[in-house]
Amino acid sequence: RRPFFIENADFFATDSNLLFTRRIADPEGGIRFTGRSGAYGFGSILINDEAPGLNRDSTDPLNGEKANIAIFRGFRDISEQSRVGFFLSDRELGEGFNRVASVDARLKLNDNWITNMQVVGTDTQPFIGGSAKTGYQRNIQINRTGRMVNFHSHFIETTDNFQTDLGFQNRFFKPDTSGIHNSLNLNFYPETSNINSWTGGLFDVYLNDTDGTRIYHQLGPNLQVNYATTSFGIRYTDYAEIL
């Protein structure tokens, strides 16, 4: 069953993981299409999943129910390393649903700088009772690569009611979080030394809930020295987490 999902899986990939195919645990049948025409790419999956209705009590409203799933992804390459795209998914089970819509962009600004942006909205009706809820997630990152300076900064904010039944959201993308993580590495190449190069770096993370209460913080400086056949490095990490 897994090869059905694995082929051309990158068609459906976005920075926020909105399709984690192991969420579709017991598919009964489905149709999948991916294709490209020039700068355009398109992918779709129509499938159902028997898992939600299995091994339930006969009085359970979801007994025997199947989740019906539709996924659509489209993108356009606008240069060698730039792309804009969209992602849509709908998972329906019983009287409920989880719908996700996203737009994303990867833009190469010049030879050194690239930015990624994504905005995601979700609309959820619980499968059994409860109130409908909507949520959103936004994230933007900027990256610099070069011989002397490498830099990464990534901001992510996710509201409390954000829900992706088909996705997988790690610590930094989870609902009710707002945070930023940064890394900076400076490379030096001495011309009159036995040292080929040395690198000094710093990594830091701030993660709060949407009310501003600190959840996690990490700070980590590092230093590495490179000789012709040997490297030496030292790192230090200080972190605090509220469970």
What are these regions (language model features)?
Residues 1, 30-71, 232:
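Carboxylate/His-rich catalytic cores and anion/metal-binding grooves
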Residues 1-35, 44:
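Residues that cap or anchor secondary-structure elements
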